[in-house]
């Protein structure tokens, strides 16, 4: 009976880990057809954001330049000009299809992530007792570690998150989140987040050492500073 009770929190933790993947898989299959039909029927003429609008306008400017080039080439025969115009027309249709698919993809991913967040929030709320048990296990495990291992683990974690090479990792992670939500890649926003997050984490971590570790385990702080130096 005790083993069964101990297995329930572990099963709950495993379900939390794999539940987002299952929700994403189910939502992508069930929502894709509905969103595609809704979008194509609605035929919306507004852009989702200014970044996408700028990208589309740049594409149409390129097509306009091609049309101007078409007018400049007068020495071509009428047949060649018709073929040239037909090629531009096909490229325009293909571009519109690609842009339409991109916008459907954006709505699908945003809706899927929103549904996943709501389901996980409700799942976590109804399983608070199991989360408390898991938290007690983690605290007991950390308590049994030596101060040297704790200091080494803290140093390793901080170097990974706010160390010298951390901006590249933040860039990859934030870029993945952007892509997962279906947002367009915007270099200025990405650079701003990459340069801001490590600074915020570093400030929070130093405050945590000053307020919590100095009070709970002064020896751990001494070992941490000795290893860090």
From Swiss-Prot:
Keywords linked to the UniProt accession: Antiport, Chloroplast, Hydrogen ion transport, Ion transport, Membrane, Plastid, Plastid inner membrane, Potassium, Potassium transport, Transmembrane, Transmembrane helix, Transport
Transmembrane segments: 6-26, 107-127, 189-209
Cellular component annotations (GO), alphabetically ordered: chloroplast inner membrane
Compartments where found: Plastid, Chloroplast inner membrane
Protein's membrane topology: Multi-pass membrane protein
InterPro entries in the cross-refs: CemA
Family: Belongs to the CemA family.
Role of this protein: Contributes to K(+)/H(+) antiport activity by supporting proton efflux to control proton extrusion and homeostasis in chloroplasts in a light-dependent manner to modulate photosynthesis. Prevents excessive induction of non-photochemical quenching (NPQ) under continuous-light conditions. Indirectly promotes efficient inorganic carbon uptake into chloroplasts.
Name of the protein: Potassium/proton antiporter CemA
Phylogenetic lineage: Eukaryota, Viridiplantae, Streptophyta, Embryophyta, Tracheophyta
Primary gene name: cemA
